[in-house]
Amino acid sequence: MMDFEDFGNPLAGKPLSQADKAAAVLLAMGKGVAGKLLKFFTQHELQMIISSAQTLRVIPPDELAQIVAEFEDLFTEGTGLMDNAKAIESILEEGLTPEEVDSLLGRRAAFQAYEASIWDRLQEAEPEFVGKFLLREHPQTIAYILSMLPSSFGAKVLLTIPEEQRADIMNRTVNMKEVSPTAAQIIEKRVVNLINEIEAERNAGGSTKVADLMNELDKPQVDTLLSSLETLSKEAANKVKPKIFLFDDLMFMPQRSRVLLLNDVSADVLTMALRGATVEIKECVLSSISPRQRRMIESDLAVPQASLNTREVAIARRAVAQEAIRLANSGQIQLKDVAAEEQSAAA
């Protein structure tokens, strides 16, 4: 129900009643829009508005602007003619275009302020963090995000992206057509999620440090430490586990990433790392290298050894794992295939 008694304070000149102001706003909207809105008034309110409209004095443009501004302020604050601001919004949407409703309720200014805050917040992160997360996005999305950033910051982010992808992204940025508001909002919502993820990772410095330490250890030592940590705090252990990558985790790496990684590792290191490994790990590694290199390594592994130098094996395995972490941090490979890991855990 309309509550005219709460609709603002008297304006300068001959004071207007609340019904006068309502009549003025409706008349200013025009016949088409006003006609659609009138059905939402009670019979008593309609009688008051009609009576006021018949005797309404001439209202100067500046005074009318004040009335409309007053009307806008009331709805922007969520109060006014009706108790339910959402109901008022739905009333306006029936009679006005989306642009007119946005303008009336001050949404456009609010959205622009929100939009600006997104890009300001993104700039607060390190370029390396931003680049790392952007690599998961479609190249066109990356191009749009870079186009929205200041040139100096955008250039730093671009340099964190692998060189083979930069040309494509720059080309997309140069040839980018105007993005529709709907598409822009979808991307900007993704940017908000991106910011939240970046901030969460920045705040997880402790778990990252612990994982870095564990990544320097052998698997039995890591398993023991994780078990002890889980006894103390399951939450802490769950934060650390995803950041640990050991030689045995090669089994959970996507095939394409595994091929890229092992292509960077020498045959001597791989041979040493595979000594004493399970059949599954051996096949996982050997199936990801060239046939020629596989034959060489299999030939070396077939030569019997008097004793297994566990220290050298551990060093070789750590070298492979550290190279994997380095490539993953630069965005060149993915460490774990979640589906494969879950399947292994369920087995």
Swiss-Prot record:
Keywords associated with the record: Bacterial flagellum, Cell inner membrane, Cell membrane, Chemotaxis, Flagellar rotation, Membrane
Record GO terms (molecular function): cytoskeletal motor activity
A GO CC term attached to the entry: plasma membrane
One of the GO biological process terms: bacterial-type flagellum-dependent cell motility
Entry's localization field: Cell inner membrane; Bacterial flagellum basal body
Domain of life of the organism encoding this protein: Bacteria
Database matches in PANTHER family: FLAGELLAR MOTOR SWITCH PROTEIN FLIG
Protein name: Flagellar motor switch protein FliG
Source organism: Agrobacterium fabrum (strain C58 / ATCC 33970)
Gene encoding the protein: fliG
